[in-house]
Amino acid sequence: MKLSKYIDHTLLKPQATEKDILKLIEEAKTYDFASVCVNPSWVKLAYENLKDTDVKVCTVVGFPLGATSTASKVYETKVAIKDGADEIDMVISVGQLKSGNDEYVKEEIKKIVEASKNKLVKVIIETCLLTEEEKVKACTLSKEAGADYVKTSTGFSTGGAKPEDIKLMRETVGKDMGVKASGGIHTREEMEVMIENGATRIGASCGVELVK
C-alpha cells in the first residue's frame, strides 16, 4: 500500500473555517489520502466535494472527551452517516473504563457500531490517560464490540501516539483489526516507525509534509 493511503488528513481545530476545510479536501484529493477527518458540522461539505473520489469522509463522535452519554454518541453517529460520513472515530468513555465498568464501555461501542450501518468504526482509547492494563482492556472491549480499529489519541489530551503503545495495541487485537496512530506525528520517520510497530492508519494534520 502506498504511504498516502495510510493517512487520515485531519483538521479538528474548533476555529477551522470553511476555507480551511476546502483546502484540506483539495490536498486530500491531490495526494490521494485515505480520508479527510473533520468535525461533524463539516461532514456534508466534505461529502459533496469528495463523493466522486476514493477519498473517504471521516468524522468524530463524543469528541474530544468521550464523556457524553451513549445516546448522544449514537445520535451523533446516525447524523454523521446521514450527512455522508464513511468512517466514525468515536471516543471511548475513559472514566467508565477506569472505573472498571467494562460492560458500559463495551455496550456503548457496540451501539455505535450498530448505528454506523457497516461504516468503519475506530475507537479512540486515549492512551495517555490509561495504564498498560487499561490499554489492553480498552482494545479487547473494542474488538469484542465489533469495532474495526483502535486508535491511540484525540490529539486534544495530554499526549499523542507512541510506538510502544502501537505495538501493545497490535499485540492485543491481533492481525485482523486496524490500529490507528494519531497525535504528535510530524515527520515521515515518525510515521514509518508507527507503521513498523503495527499501525495501519495514521491520523495527522500535516499529511502533505509526511508524503512530500
UniProtKB/Swiss-Prot annotation:
GO cellular component term, pick one: cytoplasm
Main subcellular localisation: cytoplasm
Keyword list, A-Z: Cytoplasm, Lyase, Schiff base
Positions annotated as active site in the UniProt record: 89 (proton donor/acceptor), 151 (schiff-base intermediate with acetaldehyde), 180 (proton donor/acceptor)
Catalytic class of the enzyme: lyase
Pfam families linked: DeoC (PF01791)
Localization: Cytoplasm
Key word Cytoplasm present: yes
Catalysed reaction equations from the record: 2-deoxy-D-ribose 5-phosphate = D-glyceraldehyde 3-phosphate + acetaldehyde
Pathway in which this enzyme or protein is active: Carbohydrate degradation; 2-deoxy-D-ribose 1-phosphate degradation; D-glyceraldehyde 3-phosphate and acetaldehyde from 2-deoxy-alpha-D-ribose 1-phosphate: step 2/2
SMART domains attached to this UniProt entry: DeoC
Family: Belongs to the DeoC/FbaB aldolase family. DeoC type 1 subfamily.
NCBIfam families: deoC
Name of this protein: Deoxyribose-phosphate aldolase
Organism: Clostridium botulinum (strain Hall / ATCC 3502 / NCTC 13319 / Type A)
Gene: deoC
